[in-house]
Amino acid sequence: MGAVKSRTITSADVDADEQLQHPHSHAHHHSMRNGHQHNGSISSGTLQKQDLRYDIGCSSQYQHVRQPSLRSRSQQPMPTTDELDRRFAKVLASMDLPPDKAKLLRNYDDEKKWDMICDQEMVQAKDPPSHYLSKLRTYLDPKASRSHRLYLFYFLCQKRKMVGESTSTQVLRDLEISLRTNHIEWVKEFLDDTNQGLDALVDYLSFRLQMMRHEQRLQGVLCASEERLNLTNGGDGGEIVMGNSSSVSPGGGGGLLSHGNSTGHGLANGTLDSRQQHTMSYGFLRPTIADALDSPSLKRRSRHIAKLNMGAATDDIHVSIMCLRAIMNNKYGFNMVIQHREAINCIALSLIHKSLRTKALVLELLAAICLVKGGHEIILGSFDNFKDVCQEKRRFQTLMEYFMNFEAFNIDFMVACMQFMNIVVHSVEDMNYRVHLQYEFTALGLDKYLERIRLTESEELKVQISAYLDNVFDVAALMEDSETKTSALERVQELEDQLEREIDRNSEFLYKYAELESESLTLKTEREQLAMIRQKLEEELTVMQRMLQHNEQELKKRDTLLHTKNMELQTLSRSLPRSASSGDGSLANGGLMAGSTSGAASLTLPPPPPPMPASPTASSAAPPPPPPPAPPAPPPPPGFSPLGSPSGSLASTAPSPPHAPPMLSSFQPPPPPVAGFMPAPDGAMTIKRKVPTKYKLPTLNWIALKPNQVRGTIFNELDDEKIFKQIDFNEFEERFKIGIGGALRNGSNGTEVDGSLQSSKRFKRPDNVSLLEHTRLRNIAISRRKLGMPIDDVIAAIHSLDLKKLSLENVELLQKMVPTDAEVKSYKEYIIERKDQQLLTEEDKFMLQLSRVERISSKLAIMNYMGNFVDSVHLISPQVQSIAGASTSLKQSRKFKAVLEIVLAFGNYLNSNKRGPAYGFKLQSLDTLIDTKSTDKRSSLLHYIVATIRAKFPELLNFESELYGTDKAASVALENVVADVQELEKGMDLVRKEAELRVKGAQTHILRDFLNNSEDKLKKIKSDLRHAQEAFKECVEYFGDSSRNADAAAFFALIVRFTRAFKQHDQENEQRLRLEKAAALAASKKENDQVLMRNKVNQKKQQLPSNGALSLQEAVINELKSKAHSVREKKLLQQDEVYNGALEDILLGLKSEPYRRADAVRRSQRRRIDNNRLSRTLEEMDC
């Protein structure tokens, strides 16, 4: 194998076998003979004897250094001051700190300096850089694995011993750890001209990339050949198994790198056209596979890898990238890698690695290089080289293939890929170039793919996608903005001219205004006095109205009580003569007898006589109670009617007992007391009888109590028998009946009822006809059940506009049920065709009746308006009053005026030198008091103003106490209130027109009463609204704003925000003062306890020496990490500004916050505003 040159892979290296098939060329021997002329550097990849001796000699100073133990370090005596300063200066030089940080460490005391020296001496390099470089160059030497020549036998054996048992992957891992953990001088020694470590590492990475690409192409050829064999043999071909496939990419990576080979690409997709099937045969394909497997270059590479115990190419490439990352974390190494074009090309070519983790690492490094000045051009050049080597049709084509057509989803790779594309497109300053790069990715399908994955569940990927879309340039939108800007500038010029004319006119009116102002002040004073008098009168009127309402309620209560007493007196006067003839026995019964007597007194029929033999003519009189039974709980009277009907029409339907006595005439004397109605003894319950019904009724699914469970509860005191006499249940049964088989007659059993029901089901009812749609029919049926009123009553209530008969809820239901024009037309056609209306469904009959009502929509709208008028007035009135009150209080507030005066003073003090003094400011400027920060950025201008007011004007701290109702007014939109009042006015006009259309009669008194009661209220609320508008207008103009486009909610919200911010900043000032006092007290105590604290620190250092060194350097490390904030500003870092650890800070900054341009933030805010406007416009159109 020939020597591996220190150069990148170009398009001439597409076939890697050409470089490896001529190992004995004349140039090779010439380079070996002249190897000593290059100052000890090895450019041809071979080692000389003096190089071997140099490595062994140099390594002695590292291998024989003994590491001091913890005990020996603690027992080491502190040297003299001069020696301590000399050694400490050496430690500072190795740390390579900025001057300010080095000065901070030089101010440490001697004890801390000695601790840092001891900790730094503990960290010593185990091996020199040449130890690792000699091994890498041995792996690169093609003759290290061939020892057939006798004169090189001893020298080559020594090189194999130098490699040892460790693999190349392990050597690279050790090198990466050394580069990352050793001090800076070690890294500088690795990169100096003597060792040339970067060149050796890049040469080895290039060598391993060639081998991996060769393995990937071989795997692609094998896969394509296997598919051809399968297609040729009809799918029965066998598999070809490689002897050493562990280091070959199984993912078919070669297919992605061979876009120029159309035949291989077609075979990778599993398809063959007819021409290829005709020309290719099994006998032609077989030798090609044998040549690929038995090629001399492949055998030499395999033998070289096996003899030198080299690791897998994929592992070596990944660890080599990690080594380059560690080098780039050093400021010298970063600049060397940037200037080493072959290194960047090798990093970019590592994207063909099969591991997604390696791809993500490569993309992160490339993205970080783009953020350094001049790095963007280098990265694009590396991808141009990638395009030539991998034979891409377009740049970034392979990267987009990996991004869009992944075999396994890896979130780190997707985020790194999205981050790289965002930075490589949008980190350039030239806008045209940004648009060009943006379109380059758009042509590869990035925009469509981002639209597909924008709803991904990964928050990190969402953030990167959002950052890219925020940075995107929309050229069409920019053109539109440019045209809008031109027209806006023209409009500004016109407005400026118009403003000049208006200023001239305004100066003329100033004189008139001065004359009218004095008169206005006089009128305002009189109006304020009148307003105070009016307020007092309104308060008195309110008190009198409350007293009047209270008296009316008391009068109604007394009237009701008097009416009740009068009814009781009439009842007693009717029952006294009858009860006197019955003797004292009838008055001796308990509570149930008294209740039954009072209930029977309201009936026109006399009480039933004592029991007598049964008579068939007893249907005209109420049945008598049974004779007094012997058991303690007698049954109830058999003929007792549950409905208590005075006419006794239901008495004949009640079942009579088998031995019912006959009824006497209604003129016989009253019977003796009924035993069944006497109170039951203690511990016993009266047995309730079953209530007969005419129809079958639904069942109430309740949980009933047993008689023994009722004892001691409220149900023991209830008597539902009395309710049966007071309620007419006939209508109840008509409303809730579920059977159609007729009434349940006396003496009929369940079998007969069931038979009648079953017989009725045998006859199929004719299907009803409906002119409504299915959904409309169902909605009408549901609304009709909710309505629960006959159609005649509904129509009568609509004609009379009576909200007592038709509730507001039913009116709203009917507004939804109003027939449409199409439905009215269909019903008219149905009637014209003289079809049977009885065949229509109940819902269609209902809708037919509604369609016949004239102007039903207008009438229902009037009823809805009348029903909601009071609520609307009660809702609008407080809003109007809050605006008026807030405007008046804000204008009359003296404390708020003084606060604004202080703010004006501070503003003029800040701006008078630059902009000149100001005579006033708009209230929107109060929000900017928070944004004006102090020098240390810890406090704002409002903090200082609040502190000044507390110190000089403490009486102004509660200025918000004079601002009444500003919180409520901030939540009220005056435009909406005006619109609501206008809607009330329109509704009132409809009521007036309806009253004028109707003739004088009984149906107009409702409208007249409503107009009489509501017009004054509407006039009052309109007057209050005008007063509120005038007060708000005067308030806005009083504070210097224009009242033309003023928004009440925004205006008062500004005042509320200022008052809240004032309180918050006052609390922060107080808390800051408390903390400063506590800090001062702690500082005073710290001086007294300094000796004790130093002893405790020393004890902790002896116990944990390693942690002690970290604690001493904690301040320096934190300051070094603070430089990452410059990365967050998304400004490109100059190459001379790169510091140690800058690469890690850039990567951490990109993970914490994606790359966004300043113009991208403005565009995203503009898009958000446009989207909000569009959504509001759509909502208004929907409404």
Curated annotation (Swiss-Prot):
Pfam families reported in the protein's UniProt record: Drf_FH3, Drf_GBD, FH2
GO cellular component, one term: cytosol
Regions of compositional bias (Basic residues) in chain numbering: 23-36
Modified residues (Phosphoserine): 225
InterPro entries recorded: ARM-like, ARM-type_fold, DAD_dom, FH2_Formin, FH2_Formin_sf, FH3_dom, FMNL_animal, GBD/FH3_dom
Keyword annotations from UniProtKB, A to Z: Phosphoprotein
GO biological process: axon extension; cell migration; cortical actin cytoskeleton organization; mushroom body development; ommatidial rotation; regulation of cell shape
Region described as Disordered: spans on this chain: 1-44, 63-82, 572-681
Highest rank taxon of the organism: Eukaryota
Residue ranges of domain DAD in the record: 1136-1169
Segments of skewed composition (Pro residues): 605-614, 622-640
Signal peptide: none
FH2 domain location: 687-1088
Phenotype of the disrupted gene, per the record: Lethal; shows planar cell polarity defects with abnormal ommatidial orientation. RNAi-mediated knockdown in the eye results in planar cell polarity defects with ommatidia showing defective rotation.
Entry GO MF terms: actin filament binding; GTPase binding; small GTPase binding
Occurrences of domain GBD/FH3 (ranges): 76-559
Record's compositionally biased regions (Polar residues): 63-79, 572-584
Compositional bias per record (Low complexity), positions renumbered to this chain: 641-654
Functional description taken from the UniProt entry: Together with Cdc42, involved in establishment of planar cell polarity in the developing compound eye by contributing to ommatidial rotation. Together with DAAM and Cdc42, has a role in neuronal development of mushroom bodies.
Family recorded in the similarity comment: Belongs to the formin homology family.
Domain remark in the UniProt entry: The DAD domain regulates activation via by an autoinhibitory interaction with the GBD/FH3 domain. This autoinhibition is released upon competitive binding of an activated GTPase. The release of DAD allows the FH2 domain to then nucleate and elongate nonbranched actin filaments.
Complexes and interactors: Self-associates. Interacts (via GBD/FH3 domain) with Cdc42; the interaction is stronger with the GTP bound form of Cdc42.
Name of this protein: Formin-like protein
Gene that encodes the chain: Frl
